């Protein structure tokens, strides 16, 4: 346990601290979010995911300090499954620090202050912080229950803002700061301040102001898609795709991002990050589609680059000749369209494919040409795919590294 519940009238708490035997200046953490289990079938699927994630993380944990951050929606309005989730997530074999999500709140209670009581009984405080090397981690609750049926907004209350201000006053300016919360601060640079939004944080500007003296990374979930927003040279948000992907009905998220987790490698006050599709090697960072795969773009080669930001480069080659960079566009991922097309299987109408802005297109001169897509991430790592016909069924066949 990393916390002790305080009891009224008790003045003394005895506990033993365990020394970290590894140098935490170099450490690694995985970010999972929106596990959202609501039945035994979901728990079984999550158990399978946990086994794969553990197998991948073991090589890092042998050499470095390693842990897990869970960005909320642990369950799907089913707090009775907290003990089962705890048991299954223990299979990761790493310490897990959790963040409350909107589906983890108690509904029907009289105020926001009562909405997180059951969560705290199982997982401890809704906001806290800790250090690893030259990195400072802040865990927040920005799911603000407004006591109308199942209504909530993204909002950080004044009590928490005052605590953040005091907390950061103790953090050296040259240390990295990671802020973990469930609802994104903003999904675009066009921040909608002071709007009552359930999918963004209405007073995010107050948080940004507190972070202005630090290099900070916001890490969030909630949307069930993957995306990055670079606000400026010192502030960036990473919105992480869902573990439950298509609500356990599909292993693709609605934007075409495969089920997986964020991987962050910290060295001093420097950090590198990747998205790890749980069923594929780390080198699988995008999916290319041949012309004819999309009804929206029938003539185009497409590439869905799920962890893209402005410092990535997406190029394409026709018969070995570099044709330049592909054009970013907004559209539907073809495999996601196929995966979500079985409406009977999907159930709810809102479980569907949604347009993404990390899609890229190009029109080949020769439809029979050999087309390759080459993607370079912000850290200089290059990924390449030969374009061929791809379907959701094909993706679920778990392509080998050679295929990619």
Question: Which residues make up each language-model segment?
Answer:
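N-terminal active-site segment of His-dependent metallophosphoesterases
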Residues: 3-82, 367, 395
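Active-site glycine-centered loops adjacent to acidic/histidine catalytic or metal-binding residues
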Residues: 34, 72-73, 101-102, 182, ...
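Extended active-site neighborhood of metal-dependent phosphoesterases/phosphodiesterases
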Residues: 79-173, 194-219, 228-267
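Short acidic, glycine-rich surface-loop motifs adjacent to enzyme active sites
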Residues: 171-189
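Binuclear metal-dependent phosphoesterase catalytic core
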Residues: 235-308, 312-319, 357-366, 370-386
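Short, surface-exposed loop motifs enriched in S/T, G, D/E and P with embedded aromatic residues
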Residues: 321-336, 348
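Aromatic sugar-binding surface patches on proteins
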Residues: 334-361
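Conserved small/polar residues in nucleotide/adenosyl-binding loops
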Residues: 393-400
């Amino acid at each position: 346990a990393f916390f002790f519940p305080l009891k009224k009238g008790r003045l003394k708490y005895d506990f033993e601290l365990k020394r970290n035997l590894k140098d935490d200046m170099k450490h690694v953490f995985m970010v999972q979010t929106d596990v959202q289990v609501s039945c035994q079938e979901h728990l079984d699927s999550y158990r399978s995911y946990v086994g794969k994630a553990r197998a991948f993380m073991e090589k890092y944990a042998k050499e470095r300090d390693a842990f897990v951050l869970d960005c909320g929606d642990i369950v799907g309005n089913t707090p009775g499954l907290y003990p089962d989730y705890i048991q299954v997530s223990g299979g990761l074999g790493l310490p897990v620090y959790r963040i409350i999500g909107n589906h983890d709140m108690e509904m029907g209670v009289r105020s926001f202050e009562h909405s997180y009581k059951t969560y705290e009984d199982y997982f401890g405080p809704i906001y806290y912080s800790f250090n690893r090397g030259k990195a400072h981690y802040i865990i927040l609750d920005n799911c603000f229950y407004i006591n109308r049926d199942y209504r909530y907004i993204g909002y950080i209350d004044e009590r928490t803002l005052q605590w953040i201000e005091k907390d950061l006053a103790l953090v050296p300016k040259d240390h990295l700061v990671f802020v973990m919360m469930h609802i994104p601060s903003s999904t675009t640079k066009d921040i909608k301040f002071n709007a009552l939004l359930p999918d963004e944080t209405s007073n995010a500007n107050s948080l940004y102001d507190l972070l202005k003296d630090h290099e900070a990374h916001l890490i969030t979930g909630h949307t069930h898609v993957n995306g990055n927003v670079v606000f400026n040279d010192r502030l960036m948000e990473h919105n992480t795709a869902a573990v439950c992907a298509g609500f356990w009905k599909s292993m693709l998220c609605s934007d075409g991002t495969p089920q997986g987790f964020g991987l962050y490698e910290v060295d001093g006050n420097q950090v590198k990050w990747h998205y790890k599709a749980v069923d594929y090697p780390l080198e699988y960072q995008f999916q290319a589609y041949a012309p004819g795969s999309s009804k929206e773009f029938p003539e185009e080669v497409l590439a869905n680059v799920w962890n893209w930001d402005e410092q990535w480069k997406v190029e394409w080659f026709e018969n070995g000749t570099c044709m330049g960079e592909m054009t970013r566009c907004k559209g539907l991922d073809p495999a996601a369209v196929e995966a979500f097309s079985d409406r009977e299987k999907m159930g709810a109408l809102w479980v569907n494919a949604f347009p993404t802005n990390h899609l890229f297109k190009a029109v080949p001169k020769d439809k029979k040409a050999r087309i390759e897509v080459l993607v370079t991430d912000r850290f200089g790592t290059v990924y390449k795919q030969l374009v061929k016909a791809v379907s959701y069924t094909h993706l679920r066949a778990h392509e080998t590294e050679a295929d990619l």
